[in-house]
Curated annotation (Swiss-Prot):
GO terms for molecular function: DNA-binding transcription factor activity, RNA polymerase II-specific; RNA polymerase II cis-regulatory region sequence-specific DNA binding; RNA polymerase II-specific DNA-binding transcription factor binding. It comes from Xenopus laevis (African clawed frog). It is found in: Nucleus. Involved in the transcriptional regulation of genes required for mesoderm formation and differentiation. Binds to the palindromic T site 5'-TTCACACCTAGGTGTGAA-3' DNA sequence. Causes dorsal mesodermal differentiation of animal cap ectoderm when co-expressed with wnt8 and noggin. None of these molecules causes dorsal mesoderm formation when expressed alone. Establishes the left/right axis at early gastrula stage by directly up-regulating mesodermal expression of zic3. The keyword Disulfide bond does not apply. The keyword DNA-binding applies. The gene is tbxt. Residues 293-306 have a biased composition (Polar residues). Expressed in presumptive mesodermal cells around the blastopore, and then in the notochord. SUPFAM superfamilies: p53-like transcription factors. When not bound to DNA, exists as a monomer. Binds DNA as a dimer. This is T-box transcription factor T. Coiled coil: none annotated. It comes from the Eukaryota.
């Protein structure tokens, strides 16, 4: 075998599979063909779905940039000459002589129609093609776009609020004989709109259109967000009676309480703390992460325990009484000198009378004083006193019953404490 014959054989092998593919393509729709074209038939796909839209008066969106149709117009063809070439076209004609309007949940005629726009014809992108190709699979017009502006580019211009009916035309090409057939389907009539008017049409399109699932998911997310917002608003209303919250460095959560001045503090060191503290006051996120643990406890626990919380700054500065709580975690103090009991947490009590402050000390001094976070914001620090000034024997309600000698033994005696005035006068330590 010569080199020329070998090369020709290789070329034949290379094109055989190509010719076979073409023949298979032609044979795919040939069984539906009719060279005489006497039994040409075009049938609508998804007729039941179109009928459901027809019963509700179908609507199609038209936009400046063009919007695709749904349901998509699809037809099946039979009776074409498998070996002849055809071009398939689509146009839209007015279904009536009315301009429509949507009133009280239904479409009613609303006047005379506008002049018809110049006729626009959409040519199927597979055109021209053999009859076998058109008959092999349903012909879909999924790429046609409806617009209300004259843009060109193969888009179909329609007048809004007018009813239209699509028509499909089949034209035989490639020969001297031209044959044109037209087919229309009443189920495909629709009213062109810039926005859906009938909510049932919207729901039906969302249900059956796979490309509308994103719109459905977005709507569900918005509904869920609204539910969350309503829940947060309700939670805010439940906490409105608790007033302003104050968290000291010690980790106690306190709220104003009209019944008692000092109660047991609500500790946040335990994981069973306040639920969502950062979202109680507003919806804005904090610039720094909250150090408190978020739990799913019911917010009612805070409301129920509000009477036991520490009451701090109220709307007025007049403190009528000051009672020390019987709580071992309240206002921890450190002792520098003296020999008080190691469990004592209140080494110094201040008695205010006639604008004078009389320090009563068991240990001889205060190391750190009472933090200004628990008292008035302008309260000065009394870092240290060199001496304990003896209190007068009379005139001070703190020592009316001789409670001075009992403090060391009863560190939580709250019955003999004095009342504090809103006016505090700084006093210097007495000289020796």
């Amino acid at each position: 075998m010569s080199a020329t014959e070998s090369c020709a054989k290789n070329v034949q092998y290379r094109v055989d599979h190509l010719l076979s593919a073409v023949e298979n393509e032609l044979q795919a729709g040939s069984e539906k063909g009719d060279p005489t074209e006497k039994e040409l038939k075009v049938s609508l796909e998804e007729r039941d779905l179109w009928t459901r839209f027809k019963e509700l008066t179908n609507e199609m969106i038209v936009t400046k940039n063009g919007r695709r149709m749904f349901p998509v117009l699809k037809v099946s063809m039979s009776g074409l000459d498998p070996n002849a070439m055809y071009t398939v076209l689509l146009d839209f004609v007015a279904a009536d002589n009315h301009r429509w309007k949507y009133v009280n949940g239904e479409w009613v005629p609303g006047g005379k129609p506008e002049p018809q726009a110049p006729s626009c014809v959409y040519i199927h992108p597979d055109s021209p093609n053999f009859g076998a190709h058109w008959m092999k699979d349903p012909v879909s017009f999924s790429k046609v776009k409806l617009t209300n502006k004259m843009n060109g580019g193969g888009q179909i211009m329609l007048n809004s609020l007018h009813k239209y009916e699509p028509r499909i035309h089949i034209v035989r090409v490639g020969g001297t004989q031209r044959m044109i057939t037209s087919h229309s389907f009443p189920e495909t009539q629709f009213i062109a709109v810039t926005a859906y008017q009938n909510e049932e049409i919207t729901a039906l399109k969302i249900k059956h259109n796979p490309f509308a699932k994103a719109f459905l998911d977005a709507k569900e997310r918005n509904d869920y967000k609204d539910i969350l917002d309503e829940g947060i608003d309700s939670q805010h209303s439940n906490f409105s009676q608790l007033g302003t919250w104050l968290i000291p460095n010690g980790g106690s959560l306190c709220s104003p309480n009209p019944h008692t001045q000092f109660g047991a503090p609500l500790s946040l060191s335990s994981p069973h703390g306040c639920e969502r503290y950062s979202s109680l006051r507003n919806h804005r996120s904090a610039p720094y992460p909250s150090p408190y643990t978020h739990r799913n406890n019911s917010p009612n626990n805070l409301a129920d325990n509000s009477s036991a919380c520490l009451s701090m700054l109220q709307s007025h500065d007049n403190w009528s009484t000051l009672q020390m709580p019987a709580h071992t975690g309240m206002l921890p103090m450190s002792h520098s000198t003296g020999t008080p009991p190691p469990s004592s947490q209140y080494p110094s009590l201040w008695s205010v009378s006639n604008s004078a402050i009389t320090p009563v000390s068991q240990s001889g001094g205060i190391t750190n004083g009472i933090s200004s976070q628990y008292l008035l914001g302008s309260t000065p620090h009394y870092s240290s006193l060199s001496h304990a000034v003896p209190s007068p024997s009379t005139g001070s309600p703190l020592y009316e019953h001789g409670a001075q000698t009992e403090i060391a033994e009863n560190q939580y005696d709250v019955t003999a404490h004095s009342r504090l005035s809103s006016t505090w006068t700084p006093v210097a330590p007495p000289s020796v």
